[in-house]
Structure formats: structure tokens, C-alpha cells
């Protein structure tokens, strides 16, 4: 991670950390670095945002920066991160930009870029952007006259994206009832339209954004209300998205939460059965539950692990020629259809598997059995001090000895927040609480 870029773009509290002035610079630098190869005509950049109150402020600042380097900007309005990634490619743009802080609370916001291929930027490109941001002098071009950039409104982009999603499934979903929790975020209007268009019976919650209620006790990080609604309506499936809808957490017909590990396992087995799982492999991260790996082994499906972050999952998928990967948090990547985690696409594929198999999600999830897992987030002053802290390392070693090879411990800094995550897995849920809290106590002593 760099000075500005975390694992998912630039983030901070809008108007204090992520200011309009910084957004202008990011637009100017990002627009230049990503489009300077353009030989003829103005470079094209698409831009979308979620529903945060600060989105319009940052969008206009970004726009000014992009226009100042001569870009033609296609404004999509409120749309998902995955919609921006798809439309960057579909519209032949040179770059894409999404304004969102994903699952973070509404005062935060963020900016992430996509290259012309729809993929997130590499560490190397982000490092170059940071060099320009920190340069003592702005040496980038300042076109004048007719070479100054222009803005094109393309609010039909959302419908174009939905048409693409519908083309990825062959089934119609009449007879299936789905509850959608839109997190008062980017797909508050798109999600219901998509699932109604494929004939599912749709019930929506968290679909009334007001600028400050995004992710507020709703969405993929708060699935409790979705569980209640699925049981209340006797639905076949519940789908919960985060603020920018690049992730999806499901709820089965019995009201049980189905996280990204389960979703990947279900989709991997379904793709393998059709002969469509590239290289018989699914890509996940170090956060995946031990039960996921055991379940895949029993299905004779290979797995490979990366660092946390869907960008690293995608890099490994491209390297190995794989088409399915994701994270426990619900970022699921179907590389045949999109270049990043896509909550709407994930939900649609799950519904398609339910319809094709004739089996409820509660039965499909039996492809794996989760090991008990406990995760505690500790808010700290400086997460960078985790590395090299001997007291914390010693606490981890002692807990690993207590698990005696029948479990695991993972302690890592968040890529997007001032948080250290302490996670342990093992066969005994009661034992885990004591083990994790031993490490948490040391983290608090050392870093808080």
C-alpha cells in the first residue's frame, strides 16, 4: 500500500481527508497517467458514484481534474463499481473511475480507477500516480481552447449493464422469491429491476438512499434484517449487497447466512459439473475458512490462495487462466463476465444454480462445512506498527501452539481502515474466544 492508495483505491473522510482539492489532483493525475497513450482524439473516461452525500462534491472535483487534462468524461450517475468496470470496456473508454467507500460508513468516501481493460490498477501504476500527486511542480499538460475536456451524460449506462448481466443466465426465475438488501447504496434502483426482468418475485429492503443511510444497519455487513425478511416472506433466497455492490452475501431459505466461501464453493461445483471451471481451480485468499479448502478437496477441485483484496485474486486468476475466484467477504469474480467483484452478477448466478439444480440453497451449501471462526477488529492508532512487533508475534505463536496444528491464526492490518483484524479458526468454538482475546489484549496494549 502507498501513501494514498490502500487495497481498494484512495479512501478517507470526505472533505477533511479526501478533500475536493485532492480529488481534483487525483482526477488530473489519474486522467493523465491512464490516457497519455491516446494518439488521436480526446481520451474517454467513464465515472460513476454511489449514494453518499459527498459523492456529488467529489465527482465534480474529479470531473474538473479530468477535463483539465483534456478528457472526454462519460458521467454514469449512481451505479455499482462493477457497472463502471463493465462499461469502461463496453464503451471503449481509456479509463474508468468509481467514487465510493464500499462498505464503510457514509462520512467516508473513496476513489478507485480502472484501466481500459476494466481491471483495477496494478501496484506499479498506483505508485506512478502517487509520484505525480507528490511532485513539487505540476508538469502535466494543460490543453486550451477546443482541446479542453467535455462531459457527456450517459444515465442509460445502468440499463446497458443490466442487459449484460441478464445475458449471463439461461433460466427464467418464475416461481422463485428473492429478498434484496441494497444497503441504500449504488444498486438501490438497479437490483429490483434486474431480478424482476428475469421473472423472480422480488422484495426489496434498504432501497431508499438519502445520502447518509448507506450501509446503516443494512447491506452485506449487517445481514440480520435480511435474515428476518427471508423467513417472514418464506423466500428462496436473500441477497445482501454493500454500498457499491461489488460484494454479495446470501441468506438461504432457512435464514442461514451464506458468505463468500459458501458462494464460491457452490459456484465452483456447479461450473465443474458443466466442464466450465477453468483449470479445475478456484482462487481465494488467506481469509478463506479451512472448511472451504476441505470441501473443495472432496469435490476434487484445486484451490490457490492470495493476499486479501479482490485485486490480488484477479491478478492470480489472470496469471493462471482461472475464471472463478473471490473472498469470504463476498467479493466474487466471474472472469467470464466481468473484471471485478460483482454483487448483482453473483446473486444472479446463485439463483441460476438454484433453478437449474432444483435444490434449495440450504442443500446446495452442504458442499462444505465451516470450521468455527472468530474475527475481532481492533481499532488502532497506527496499523503499520503491527509488522515487527515482537510482543504480538509471541502471542500469536503461543496461540498457534495451543491449536496444535488443528486450526490457524491470522492477524493482519485492514487495507482500508485503521484496524487490525485478529482471526482464528479451530474445531472448538468455545476455545476460540479465549485464544483470540489473548491476542486482542496484546494488540490493544501495543497499538492502541
Curated annotation (Swiss-Prot):
UniProt entry tagged with the keyword Metal-binding: yes
Domain of life: Bacteria
EC number: 5.4.2.10
SUPFAM superfamilies listed in its UniProt record: Phosphoglucomutase, C-terminal domain (SSF55957), Phosphoglucomutase, first 3 domains (SSF53738)
Binding positions for Mg(2+) per the UniProt entry: 102, 242, 244, 246
Cellular component terms per the entry's GO annotation: cytosol
UniProt KW keywords: Isomerase, Magnesium, Metal-binding, Phosphoprotein
Catalytic activity: alpha-D-glucosamine 1-phosphate = D-glucosamine 6-phosphate
PTM note: Activated by phosphorylation.
Cofactor-binding details, from the entry: Binds 1 Mg(2+) ion per subunit.
InterPro entries attached to this UniProt entry: A-D-PHexomutase_a/b/a-I, A-D-PHexomutase_a/b/a-I/II/III, A-D-PHexomutase_a/b/a-II, A-D-PHexomutase_a/b/a-III, A-D-PHexomutase_C, A-D-PHexomutase_C_sf, A-D-PHexomutase_CS, Alpha-D-phosphohexomutase_SF
One annotated GO molecular function: phosphoglucosamine mutase activity
Family under the similarity heading: Belongs to the phosphohexose mutase family.
Function noted in UniProt: Catalyzes the conversion of glucosamine-6-phosphate to glucosamine-1-phosphate.
Protein known as: Phosphoglucosamine mutase
Organism this protein belongs to: Brevibacillus brevis (strain 47 / JCM 6285 / NBRC 100599)
Amino acid at each position: 500500500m502507498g501513501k494514498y492508495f490502500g487495497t481498494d483505491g484512495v479512501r478517507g473522510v470526505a472533505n477533511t481527508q479526501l478533500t475536493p482539492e485532492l480529488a481534483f489532483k487525483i482526477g488530473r493525475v489519474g486522467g493523465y497517467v491512464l490516457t497519455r497513450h491516446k494518439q488521436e482524439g480526446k481520451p474517454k473516461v467513464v465515472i460513476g458514484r454511489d449514494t453518499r452525500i459527498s459523492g456529488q462534491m467529489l465527482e465534480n472535483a474529479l470531473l474538473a481534474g479530468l477535463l483539465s487534462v483534456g478528457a472526454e468524461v462519460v458521467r454514469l450517475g449512481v451505479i455499482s463499481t462493477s457497472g463502471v468496470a463493465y462499461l469502461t470496456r463496453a464503451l471503449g473508454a481509456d479509463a474508468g473511475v468509481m467514487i465510493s467507500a464500499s462498505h464503510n460508513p457514509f462520512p467516508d468516501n473513496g476513489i478507485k480507477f480502472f484501466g481500459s481493460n476494466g481491471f483495477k490498477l496494478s501496484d506499479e501504476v498506483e505508485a506512478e500516480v502517487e509520484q505525480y500527486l507528490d511532485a513539487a511542480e505540476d508538469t502535466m499538460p494543460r490543453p486550451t481552447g477546443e482541446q479542453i475536456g467535455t462531459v457527456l451524460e450517459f444515465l442509460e449506462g445502468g440499463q446497458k449493464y443490466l442487459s449484460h448481466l441478464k445475458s449471463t443466465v439461461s433460466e427464467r426465475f418464475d416461481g422463485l422469491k428473492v429478498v434484496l438488501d441494497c444497503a441504500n447504496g449504488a444498486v438501490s434502483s438497479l437490483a429490483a429491476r434486474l431480478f424482476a426482468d428475469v421473472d423472480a418475485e422480488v422484495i426489496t429492503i434498504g432501497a431508499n438512499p438519502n445520502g447518509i443511510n448507506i450501509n446503516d444497519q443494512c447491506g452485506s455487513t449487517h445481514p440480520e434484517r435480511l435474515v428476518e425478511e427471508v423467513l417472514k416472506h418464506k423466500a428462496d433466497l436473500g441477497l445482501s449487497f454493500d454500498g457499491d455492490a461489488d460484494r454479495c452475501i446470501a441468506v438461504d431459505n432457512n435464514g442461514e447466512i451464506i458468505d463468500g466461501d459458501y458462494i464460491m464453493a457452490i459456484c465452483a461445483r456447479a461450473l465443474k459439473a458443466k466442464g466450465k471451471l477453468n483449470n479445475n481451480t478456484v482462487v481465494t485468499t488467506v481469509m478463506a475458512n479451512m472448511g472451504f479448502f476441505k470441501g473443495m478437496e472432496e469435490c476434487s477441485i484445486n484451490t490457490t490462495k492470495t493476499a486479501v483484496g479482490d485485486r490480488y485474486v484477479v491478478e492470480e486468476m489472470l496469471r493462471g487462466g482461472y475464471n472463478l475466484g473471490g473472498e469470504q467477504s463476498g467479493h466474487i469474480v466471474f472472469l467470464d463476465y466481468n473484471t471485478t467483484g460483482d454483487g448483482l452478477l453473483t446473486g444472479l448466478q446463485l439463483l441460476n444454480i438454484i433453478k437449474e439444480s432444483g435444490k434449495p440453497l440450504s442443500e446446495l451449501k452442504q458442499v462444505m462445512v465451516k470450521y468455527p471462526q472468530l474475527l475481532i477488529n481492533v481499532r488502532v492508532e497506527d496499523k503499520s506498527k503491527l509488522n515487527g512487533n515482537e510482543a504480538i508475534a509471541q502471542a500469536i505463536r503461543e496461540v498457534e501452539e495451543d491449536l496444535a496444528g488443528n486450526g490457524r491464526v491470522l492477524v493482519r492490518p485492514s487495507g482500508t481502515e485503521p484496524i487490525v483484524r485478529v482471526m482464528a479458526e479451530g474445531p472448538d468454538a468455545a476455545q476460540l474466544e479465549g485464544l483470540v482475546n489473548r491476542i486482542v489484549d496484546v494488540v490493544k496494549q501495543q497499538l492502541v
